[in-house]
Amino acid sequence: MDFFKLKEHDTNVRTEIIAGTTTFLAMAYILAINPSILGTVMNENGVFVATALASAISTFIMGLWANYPIALSAGLGLNAYFAFTVCIGELNQFGDPANPNPSVPNAWMICLTAVFVEGIIFMILSIFKVREKLVNGIPVNLKHGITAGIGLFVAFIGMQGANIIIADSSTIVGLGSFKDPALVLAIVGVIIIVVFAHHHVKGAVLYGILITWGLGIIAEKIGWYHVDPANGVFSVIPDKVLSLDFSGLKETAFHFDFGWSLAHLPQFIAIIVSFLYVDLFDTVGTVVGVAEKANLLDENGELPKAGPVLMTDAIGTSLGACLGTSTITSFVESTAGVAEGGRTGLTAVTTGCWFLLALAFSPLFLAIPSFATAPALIYVGMLMVQSVTKMSFEDDPADTMGGYMAFIMMPLSYSIATGIMFGMMTWVIVKVFTGKAKDVSVVMWVVFFIFLARIASIVTNFF
């Protein structure tokens, strides 16, 4: 095992395997949540297989090439943007006007095409080390606001999935009924996860999902949870446990739509830019955070071999799109494995092996109901929202307003891209009108004019 330089990193095989297993337990919920979210617009089984394969291969590359204990999978928030904001939302305006419910039939294919191109662009940016420069050009308060906003957005989606928050014609949204078993079970699930996390139980999120699901099975058996497929209430009891079913993969793999993308290039570019920036913040922040916790940063606070790390993330994104899943990114849950002593790529390789093994249990993961995965979304959202505490509210409001707008607009507009646009544009405008235009970096000016052009196109109905 000298390949991983275990002695140099003061670790051993046993520790690395335990760490890799812990990381998997901490992030395995994505195998239930990603098919649940993307399954609203794609083949659910295909998404599951694509997620497991892309996660395994990307994590293997990270471990074998970069030799870092960082695992990758489909990013939360990015998958929600993929399914709800773009597929169901933004692309609807380009459907057939004669259709009472206009939409683009191949919306998810267009999104996969955008994710694939995003990965290629990231590869190019990684080669020329542009990604690091882009991140350094974005204000810290804005980064924190974006992360926190994604957290609120993810939590909101979770609450919708559990019927905690429902549509209301008078107030737009309202509180669901406590007579609904899904709502009650989801709240119990949140409590379970928090209690486990409080006691530092590794895999608290996964255990929370499984226990909530188990309670749902009991609820169905005793007749409290009523199955009603016509109203979207399905059985939570799987018909089998083991199955190497790859049939759904043919419904998702290599399903690109370059025709529409080229015919509507301005809109396609706008989608790519949104994916680019959201993925950029998530990846770099996660990588630095995990590296710092694992004491992998050098004396200058920089990450050695940052190139292979960021390139792996880019390769994973394009690979995931080819297989049929949303943006692949580094997972902050990798810190769970680091906390168990993981220091090398052997930790990542172990996690990758677990993702491959998970392929045999697809019926189990696909039977997990939304009310069982909702607690995970709500809890992970809380972890992300903590970034707002890093914003300097007591200092100059000109430094904080942009981050605040990003933070608040994401859930209210139900769009990550809109939140980023409001945040970045607000930051630049406030700086200019408070006489601090010199604080605006070249990167921020470029982004400002990109979003300004996008707004102009919407107003003039040019795109």
What do these predicted ranges mean?
Residues 90, 104-214, 349-463:
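Membrane-embedded alpha-helical modules
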Residues 42-60:
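Loop-to-helix transition at the N-terminal end of transmembrane alpha-helices
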Residues 54-76:
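Juxtamembrane transmembrane-helix boundary signature
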Residues 17, 37, 134, 203, ...:
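Residue-level signature of catalytic and energy-coupling elements of molecular machines
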